[in-house]
Amino acid sequence: MRWKKLLFWGSALLSVGADQLTKFWVTQNFELRRPPAQPDTWPLIQNVFHFTYVTNDGAAFSLFKDSPLLPWLSFLVCLGLIGLGLFGPRFPQWEQAGYGFLLGGAAGNGIDRIFLGEVIDFLDFRLIQFPVFNIADISINVGLACLIFATWQSSRKGSRKTPTP
């Protein structure tokens, strides 16, 4: 296999690896406390940024909570992105990175959903009262940002080729 999609596979492996390693670290160093108990937390900057061990059995921001289809949806998204990586065309660099980060993020949270029944979250920005999240969530957002940038970049290139009246 030629490495014509190295950025795709590299960003996918980097993001799923970082996600699973950080979640392993959290499970080894924090105690999972179920509500109504307060979660185990470690303030890096008091009332600004904490590591807080919580779980989420829904998707982003607890959407689709308790849905039995969510693990299968994660699996199908990963399967589609793997298929794109194996059989799809060679995309420009920003698209490769974008799809790779999406795959890594979907796989990271999908692994949790399939094997644990819930996703481990631990990044807690208290200053802005943002929901607790994880590296996989960051990877998904980075992937979307890369794809938006790729679309913007290609539309700029396309508009340069169009003659003006």
UniProtKB/Swiss-Prot annotation:
Class of enzymatic activity (EC top level): hydrolase
The enzyme's E.C. designation: 3.4.23.36
Keywords: Aspartyl protease, Cell inner membrane, Cell membrane, Hydrolase, Membrane, Protease, Transmembrane, Transmembrane helix
Membrane topology: Multi-pass membrane protein
Catalyzed chemical reaction(s): Release of signal peptides from bacterial membrane prolipoproteins. Hydrolyzes -Xaa-Yaa-Zaa-|-(S,diacylglyceryl)Cys-, in which Xaa is hydrophobic (preferably Leu), and Yaa (Ala or Ser) and Zaa (Gly or Ala) have small, neutral side chains
Entry's Gene Ontology molecular function annotations: aspartic-type endopeptidase activity
One Pfam family named in its UniProt record: Peptidase_A8
Domain of life: Bacteria
Annotated signal peptide: none
Biological processes annotated in GO: proteolysis
Residues annotated as the enzyme's active site: 121, 137
One term under GO cellular component: plasma membrane
Pathway linked to the protein: Protein modification; lipoprotein biosynthesis (signal peptide cleavage)
Protein localization: Cell inner membrane
Spans through the membrane: 68-88, 100-120, 130-150
Family recorded in the similarity comment: Belongs to the peptidase A8 family.
PANTHER family (UniProt xref): LIPOPROTEIN SIGNAL PEPTIDASE
UniProt function note: This protein specifically catalyzes the removal of signal peptides from prolipoproteins.
Protein name: Lipoprotein signal peptidase
Organism: Acaryochloris marina (strain MBIC 11017)
